[in-house]
Amino acid sequence: DKIAATFESYWNSSEFEYYSEDQKERLARALKAEKYFDSNNAEVYTMDITPYSYQQEILDKLEAERTIRRYTRNLVVAATGTGKTVISALDYKRFCKQNSGKPCRLLFVAHREEILRQSLYTFRAVLKDANFGELFVGNYRPESIDHLFLSIQTFNSQDFTAKTAPDFYDYIVVDEFHHAAAPTYQKLLSYYQPKILLGLTATPERMDGKSVLPYFNNRIAAEIRLPEAIDRKLLCPFQYFGVTDTVDLNTLKWSAGGYDKGELSNLYTLSGAVANRRADLVVSSLLKYVTDIDEVKGLGFCVSIEHAEFMCHYFNDCGIPSIFLTGKSSDEERKAAKGRLVSGEIRFIFVVDIYNEGVDIPEVNTVLFLRPTESLTIFLQQLGRGLRLAEDKECLTVLDFIGQANKKYNFEDKFAALLSNTTRSVIREIKDGFVSAPKGCYIQLEKKAAKYILDNIRASYGNTAGLVSRVASFTEDSGLELTLANFLDYYHLDPRAIYKFSSFSRICARADTIADFSEPLEE
């Protein structure tokens, strides 16, 4: 039955094309390109790269935004692994075709050299031009700036606006656009006036509350979020286990950016028996939840270099061959580490500040979250490292270590981002066993871990400011009409959670969802 159901889902999927004998040569070329993609392989630049159906849907929506609404600044939200860069390259190719004979100058902006290099190779492949574009980042210096892949750091340090007029670039792509609310991007976004601005991101939501949507008429032109991507079999399913952590983070220093990383690192590495007990929990949980440790190809996300090194040594001492990498590791070290992991020589790479954005090891089948991740963007990027499809890979196993957290730590958004049904609150999902997980996915919380999360979420309703904030965003979050009954039902609240502070109408007025009013009896 399972085989028949799987076949039926593939047969009816729009992601597959009908095959006939006259397409044999095209299939052979495509399979070869998929297997042997190499930026130095000239044959790559002779292949026709066509969009998948979901990518074509996004391209069509972009065209509609521009032709019907006349919006030339557009944001595409696409889950890690769905080919955001390919979409931008295909869109640029269409732009060039529509403006044949014109320069069609391109500026592609990102904040990491790895992203820029991969993006340049992608554009060259889509355009079938091995000489297209140049890098301006690190040690790379371009001969021409007409088609430029530029880091935001170089843009600012080189005073790039002095070299170019506001309308010099016809088409500008800003990758990982969630960074664009930062001060470093403001000069670029305010100075240039391109014919087309395209923003790309997997998660437009920022933990500091600053929105990037005003750059795009407060609209998302097209999106394919993580649950939809899994449902459409563009990413592999996951089994997520929330493991009860042995350490209490409730007393650690908290600032605007989250936990103090130094205190976290010391707790995880220098606290003697506490650190060893936690590391032992990680190993025992791994052995409990994975089917075969010898088949594991894993990444462990750590808070510091010391933490990554500590976990690496602990795993090796337990007979689980591992290495660690940091943001300072060279390209050669990273490539060698990837090869050793894929070949099975090692089981884990413990990392700090890498494998978040723009780096892929599709074979990864296990991810360990060994530190609290305050940023939803980073959480989804790190999760996405393991969601790539790969041969003989059935699913991704995720172990997230959950302890008592600061009341300001946001568990809710993290779990909401994993669920297909946005009309049910996270509290209800926890109580019902995460029935809205994407197809083929499974979320399980250990008993104490579930209690820590529920207590944390409920605490966020424990003051008037928290209630006002949730009322203000209720319709957007839930898709429901804002009524007292809907609010209580969605958040699984007792009415006393509201009325111990104020009336529901007064909270709505403070949230600007209704007009202010005067009620003498309130006194």
Region roles according to the model:
Residues 1-82, 86-104, 121-125:
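ATP-dependent helicase/translocase motor core
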Residues 26-50, 288, 413-523:
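Long, largely alpha-helical accessory region at the distal end of helicase-like NTP-driven motors
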Residues 114-137:
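Conserved helix-turn-beta segment of the N-terminal RecA-like "Helicase ATP-binding" lobe
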Residues 117, 135-141, 160, 309-312, ...:
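Conserved helicase ATPase core of P-loop NTP-dependent helicases/translocases
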Residues 179-241:
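Post-DEXD/H (motif II) to motif III coupling segment of the RecA-like Helicase ATP-binding lobe
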Residues 220-299:
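Conserved interdomain linker/interface between the two RecA-like ATPase lobes of SF2 helicase motors
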Residues 265-339:
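Conserved helicase/translocase motor-coupling segment
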Residues 376-381, 385-415:
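Conserved segment of the helicase C-terminal RecA-like domain
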